[in-house]
């Protein structure tokens, strides 16, 4: 097993996740099997109870793990399926060590950070790195380990020490370190001092970088590269220029041009790993498809505007998987994506009284967009604005996709304005509302006391109902009888309301195995009005877009019929 560690210095949020994912993708183009682990040095057990505005989105895995958003990057770039154990947090490791102490596994010894915690971290890395993550079912060849935060922070100290020990545990030929640093441009001059200081801190902790990935707003000058190499005690070929590009999907090719994989191949002796001809051919095909993808991005000029009506729009990372799913779909449709951010509460009548200009701008943005997306969320704030957005899409035949909460507000809107239930709402918004007004109800099996890990989580099947051959979303799924998607919710459509809703044209074309829990709704006689209780964005891949999102973008671009025809003729992974 080969290990490539990606750490960061100077500042957080520097792009370690994209660089780690891109490195893994390039290793896959050699035919290698690649996995990934993310270390998050916070005390939370997982990301499930953290505010999206605090930490970005919570990414959900097949096994129901609520993890850091970087695991989404790994899955999208590498085409793998990770587990909750691929996300290590300080809280998880401490819980693991304390559980062993309570069982007496340490035989009465004083339990300390070194060696007990650091050994637990190393054991975790070795165990999880060997878990098969792709369709081959075989143990991976290479594991990418991303250390979150910034080296030198007190929170990451135990993990840095564990990695220092780990390099000797696995051997030099099996361990490489890429350190990501910032090269700011001040008054037109590229400054190397922050990188020099970051590498000095790293070396003082016992870790030596094999490569330094320099993030900069512009391409690094040759003298800058030579200066970093000289003062950081590495060769110029070990300094990688990761400047800003038009799209993050260009980053793997940017690294390839600088022969990063050639260096890692020599450093880790990757040629010793025995690969079959089929593995190498698969890797070559992956690289060809990626080149084709980036070319399609550069040649996409026709714009499609999607209004994203959310309640966490002040931090775009709150909707990272949604953004990526839209990007994947727009690339398939050969369109240039423009996301129009609309804060849901700005659409509500109360905003007209408090800030008329903001209210008018929100409605102008919504009404001028080609398609409308209402993503997931929790709580009451902004939900009336989402309901109004769903109403606008329904009445004006604008392509609409609702996800999780987006399905619930679409159903409430339909109940209010088509069924005539004026006070229709959700028991999440108004717990004391009369039962005949509850369009959305709390799922009976869900724990109401504890918040962490108590939702309906992970990969679950959705069964398409009889007489749904007309359904656009079913056609997008290749007319399948069932699909499996990832869930994260506590509330569901009230089963007692379903018959009346369907009688008026709101069809629940997909349900769970019992046939009672509604998973997909679709409006009859509408260009594209679809909503899902599950989160399809979590399974969207760069080269294999999520079907509900693909339908939204294609409908918004007025190419849905031709897309469906192409998908039927060539297959779901065809380059349309």
UniProtKB/Swiss-Prot annotation:
GO biological process per UniProt: 'de novo' CTP biosynthetic process; CTP biosynthetic process; pyrimidine nucleobase biosynthetic process
GO cellular component, one term: cytoophidium
Signal peptide: none
UniProt domain Glutamine amidotransferase type-1: residue ranges: 305-559
Keywords, in A-Z order: ATP-binding, Glutamine amidotransferase, Ligase, Nucleotide-binding, Pyrimidine biosynthesis
Gene Ontology MF annotations: ATP binding; CTP synthase activity; identical protein binding
Reactions this protein catalyses: UTP + L-glutamine + ATP + H2O = CTP + L-glutamate + ADP + phosphate + 2 H(+)
Catalytic residues in the record: 404 (for gatase activity), 535 (for gatase activity), 537 (for gatase activity)
Superkingdom of this protein's organism: Eukaryota
PROSITE patterns in UniProt: GATASE_TYPE_1
Assigned EC number: 6.3.4.2
Pathway the protein acts in: Pyrimidine metabolism; CTP biosynthesis via de novo pathway; CTP from UDP: step 2/2
Keyword Ligase listed: yes
Family (UniProt): Belongs to the CTP synthase family.
NCBIfam families, alphabetized: PRK05380.1, PyrG
Role summary: Catalyzes the ATP-dependent amination of UTP to CTP with either L-glutamine or ammonia as the source of nitrogen.
Name of the featured protein: CTP synthase
Organism this protein belongs to: Eremothecium gossypii (strain ATCC 10895 / CBS 109.51 / FGSC 9923 / NRRL Y-1056) (Yeast)
Gene name tied to this protein: URA7
């Amino acid at each position: 097993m080969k290990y490539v560690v990606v750490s960061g210095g100077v500042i957080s949020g520097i792009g370690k996740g994209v660089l780690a994912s891109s490195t893994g993708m390039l290793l896959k183009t050699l035919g290698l099997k690649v996995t990934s682990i993310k270390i998050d040095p916070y005390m939370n057990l997982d990301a499930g109870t953290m505010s999206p505005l605090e930490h970005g989105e919570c990414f959900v895995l097949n096994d129901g793990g609520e993890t850091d958003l970087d695991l989404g990057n790994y899955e999208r770039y590498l085409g793998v399926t990770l587990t909750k154990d691929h996300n290590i947090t300080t809280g998880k490791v401490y819980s693991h060590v304390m559980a062993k102490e309570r069982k007496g596994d340490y035989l009465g010894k004083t339990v300390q950070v070194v060696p007990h915690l650091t050994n637990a971290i190393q054991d975790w890395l070795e165990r999880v790195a060997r878990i098969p993550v792709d369709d081959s079912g075989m143990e991976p060849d290479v594991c990418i380990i991303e250390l979150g935060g910034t080296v030198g922070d007190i929170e990451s100290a135990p993990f840095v020490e564990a990695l220092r020990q780990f390099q000797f545990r696995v051997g030099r030929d099996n361990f490489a370190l890429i350190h990501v640093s910032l090269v700011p441009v001040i008054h037109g001059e590229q400054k190397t001092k922050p990188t020099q200081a970051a590498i000095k801190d790293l070396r003082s902790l016992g870790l030596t970088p094999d490569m330094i990935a320099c993030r900069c707003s512009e391409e690094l000058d040759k003298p800058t590269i030579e200066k970093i190499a000289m003062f950081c005690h590495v060769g110029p070929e070990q300094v990688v220029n990761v400047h800003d590009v038009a799209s993050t999907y260009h980053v793997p090719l940017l690294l390839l041009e600088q022969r990063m994989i050639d260096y890692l191949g020599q450093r880790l002796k990757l040629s010793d790993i025995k690969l079959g001809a089929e593995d190498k051919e698969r890797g070559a095909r992956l690289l060809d498809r990626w080149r084709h993808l980036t070319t399609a991005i550069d040649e996409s000029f026709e714009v499609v505007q999607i209004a994203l009506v959310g309640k966490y729009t002040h931090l775009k990372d709150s909707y990272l998987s949604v953004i990526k799913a839209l990007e994947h779909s727009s690339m398939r449709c050969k369109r240039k994506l423009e996301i129009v951010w609309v804060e849901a509460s700005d659409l509500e009548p109360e905003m007209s009284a408090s800030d008329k200009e903001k209210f008018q701008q929100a409605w102008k943005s919504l009404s001028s967009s080609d398609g409308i997306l209402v993503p997931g969320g929790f709580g009451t704030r902004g939900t009336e604005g989402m309901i109004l957005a769903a109403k606008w899409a329904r009445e004006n035949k604008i392509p609409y996709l609702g996800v999780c909460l987006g399905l619930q507000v679409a159903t409430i809107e339909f109940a209010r304005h088509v069924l005539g239930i004026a006070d229709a709402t959700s028991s999440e918004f108004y717990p004391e509302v009369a039962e005949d007004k509850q369009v959305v109800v709390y799922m009976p099996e869900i724990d109401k006391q504890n918040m962490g890990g108590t939702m309906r989580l992970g990969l679950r099947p959705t069964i398409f109902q009889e007489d749904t051959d007309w359904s656009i979303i079913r056609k997008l799924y290749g007319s399948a009888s069932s699909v499996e998607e990832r869930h994260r919710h506590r509330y569901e459509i009230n089963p007692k309301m379903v018959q009346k809703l369907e009688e008026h044209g709101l069809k629940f074309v997909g349900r769970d195995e019992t046939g009672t829990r509604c998973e997909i709704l679709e409006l009859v006689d509408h260009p594209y009005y679809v909503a899902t209780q599950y989160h399809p964005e979590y399974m969207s891949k760069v080269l294999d877009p999520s079907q509900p999102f693909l339908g939204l973008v294609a409908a918004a671009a007025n190419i849905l019929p031709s897309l469906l025809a192409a998908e039927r003729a060539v297959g779901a992974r065809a380059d349309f």
